[in-house]
Amino acid sequence: MVVKFTKSEALHKEALEHIVGGVNSPSRSFKAVGGGAPVAMERGKGAYFWDVDGNKYIDYLAAYGPIITGHAHPHITKAITTAAENGVLYGTPTALEVKFAKMLKEAMPALDKVRFVNSGTEAVMTTIRVARAYTGRTKIMKFAGCYHGHSDLVLVAAGSGPSTLGTPDSAGVPQSIAQEVITVPFNNVETLKEALDKWGHEVAAILVEPIVGNFGIVEPKPGFLEKVNELVHEAGALVIYDEVITAFRFMYGGAQDLLGVTPDLTALGKVIGGGLPIGAYGGKKEIMEQVAPLGPAYQAGTMAGNPASMASGIACLEVLQQEGLYEKLDELGAMLEKGILEQAAKHNIDITLNRLKGALTVYFTTNTIEDYDAAQDTDGEMFGKFFKLMLQEGVNLAPSKYEAWFLTTEHTKEDIEYTIEAVGRAFATLADNK
């Protein structure tokens, strides 16, 4: 059992003197789980982390999804090392970027053409620009609670109803930008139709997480994505899939392959970089030809397509092509789901568990979670206590009730068995302190 965080606490105190909030992304802070110093990790290998105090953890954070092959996978590490030895940045075309683009196209047939960028935020931001250029329209639709990066246009909350325009979800986002965004509930065809009836003639595109990963793992209802395509295309707008989390996570060809629904544009990130910074976007040839130098929609990047990220991404996809890999993730996910539910029943802890293959979310509620409102109405205080108990047990989760547990190819049945036992001990403590 982990009992000391002395060095993490000291490091966080020092970090507060030099780094805003002591972290380089707010999701790493422990603010959402009752506060305290976040645990600072020193190294990772396979499914495990070791922190600066020497404590070992089974890792289900997986860097919020990208580390599907585990930490320091030898094939990926070798590719990165070779790329570094050859020079990490040229500012010129390379053979690696062509090879990687071909691999992405082969995996996802909806990608006639692709372009590499440096993050998922950039990828989404640029698909919006391209959609606006192609349609000549300005407004964007999105689903409530779905995170699409931190660019101004997507940091927008819902208005007072489905036919109202959005409001800024962050300081520094002008109201004028928020007025270009319509936010509707996920999994609700009627409100989508109502919004399109009012604003459809001004909408350039709708942003869709085909499987939600940002208020937990939430699947679309049967037929929902097909209806989104139908209604949005009837309005003359485009469908953009944000597959930054989902691509290569649940299936090699992404959520669009798993679900059998095809978007006009796709944004990628996370997993495709093998742990290095990356993003990509792509789609139909006639739409992508809006992008400079062929078309009027400008997008550029000094680091885009850099050899290190390309080599890492190629190596990651080569690992993910191994036979039986996704079946293993599903098998371990099912084992973990069954064990957590059994422990919840044993200790009389109310939870709802959403799982798809090797990713799951534990919500402290008895309600079904199909949209953001339901996810919001869950017990965050209880989750915060659970999170810290699991940390003491040597199990690393994301410090937010909205995030997923991500399995990697390196987790074992023994890891799952230990995790279930740890969940049982945590639930027992929560039950004793009700």
Curated annotation (Swiss-Prot):
Transport in keyword set: no
Modified residues (N6-(pyridoxal phosphate)lysine): 270
Catalytic activity: (S)-4-amino-5-oxopentanoate = 5-aminolevulinate
Transmembrane is among the record's keywords: no
One Gene Ontology molecular-function label: pyridoxal phosphate binding
Cofactor: pyridoxal 5'-phosphate
GO terms, biological process: protoporphyrinogen IX biosynthetic process
InterPro entries for the chain: 4pyrrol_synth_GluAld_NH2Trfase, Aminotrans_3, Aminotrans_3_PPA_site, PyrdxlP-dep_Trfase, PyrdxlP-dep_Trfase_major, PyrdxlP-dep_Trfase_small
Pathway: Porphyrin-containing compound metabolism; protoporphyrin-IX biosynthesis; 5-aminolevulinate from L-glutamyl-tRNA(Glu): step 2/2
Main location: cytoplasm
Family recorded in the similarity comment: Belongs to the class-III pyridoxal-phosphate-dependent aminotransferase family. HemL subfamily.
Stored NCBIfam families: hemL, PRK00062.1, PRK12389.1
UniProt subunit comment: Homodimer.
Stated name of the protein: Glutamate-1-semialdehyde 2,1-aminomutase 1
Source organism: Bacillus thuringiensis (strain Al Hakam)
